[in-house]
Amino acid sequence: MPRTDRRPPAHLLAWVEQTLGRGASVAEWKRLTGGLTSIVHRLTIERNGRREECVLRWWLPHSKWEHWMMLAVPTETAILTKLEGNDIPAPRVIGSTTDALLGGPALLMTRLPGKVHLMPRDRERWLRQMAQMLTRIHALAVDGKPFESWLDRRQLSPPPDASRADIWKEAIALVAEERAPTRTCFLHRDYQHFNMLWARERLTGVVDWSEACVGPPEVDVGHCRLNLTVLFSADVADRFRAIYEAESGHTVDPWWDVQALLAYGPSWKQFLPIQIDGRAPLDVDGMTGRMEEVLERALRRL
């Protein structure tokens, strides 16, 4: 069996074959780029002389993500099941387990066409497709757990390399107290370009639904804007917001936008290059400066 990087454990592959049913065997496997909290492999399955592909997402046991992943697998399984029959290009669940004896936590899914695409020929069209897809997601009548912020407001402070500490302090003071959202909807919760698949400049899939929930739409918009800012610029992030507002017919609440943007911190300079993995140029030193620009613009919209 050909190998690429970390091999899935034998007992996990045995679970895959058992889940797929009689006559199925894993012929090949390849680890896919990305996956900060999990390991993702594309599996080639042989059955009755034919080959098909599926995707295996699994987590190492006893990692720092152990508590989270035991909740993430059933959550994503439930959400993907609810998405079946909708027009959102999400994977379909083949099987899932949290049983460590079977190699869990693990999630076996259908493979969607396409791959992560960070350097489009037409960025405007790229952003438009992202905004249109998010509008469609937010329009879904799908239930989910209530939104919980990733921010610990007590720990917020300007990044060590901040050149505009005043902007950070203003933003932190703004979100010091909770604010009720003006509207709520179904959220992907980690909507950004690393969780989108593209083929021939067309958005073909949205993956990683483990944090899906119900909350303010700005949570998704702001998180995507954060990721666009650190990789590209505040201008690109603002253009995404403008397209989303035009497509959805709703104005993005700047308070919730700022709250989402404040998820940026020093660790982004460490993990973002790992996520990008050479697929796009990245100015690491300029990340905080770009975030200051997008935060200042968001604050001006209040």
Task: Map each language-model feature to its residues.
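An alpha-helical support segment within catalytic cores of ATP-dependent transferases
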Residues: P8-A24, T135-R189, A199-R200, R290-L302
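Short, surface-exposed acidic
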Residues: G21-E28, S248-D257
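ATP-binding pocket architecture of kinase catalytic cores
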Residues: W29-W150, D166, P181
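Active-site acidic catalytic loop and adjacent metal/ATP-binding pocket
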Residues: T33, T37-I45, V55-L56, V93, ...
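Start-of-helix signal in alpha-solenoid helical-repeat scaffolds, especially tetratricopeptide repeats
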Residues: V73, V258-Q259
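Active-site activation/catalytic loop segments of kinase-like enzymes and analogous catalytic loops
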Residues: E218-H250, L261-R279
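Helical subdomain adjoining the active site within ATP-dependent kinase catalytic cores
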Residues: Q270-L302
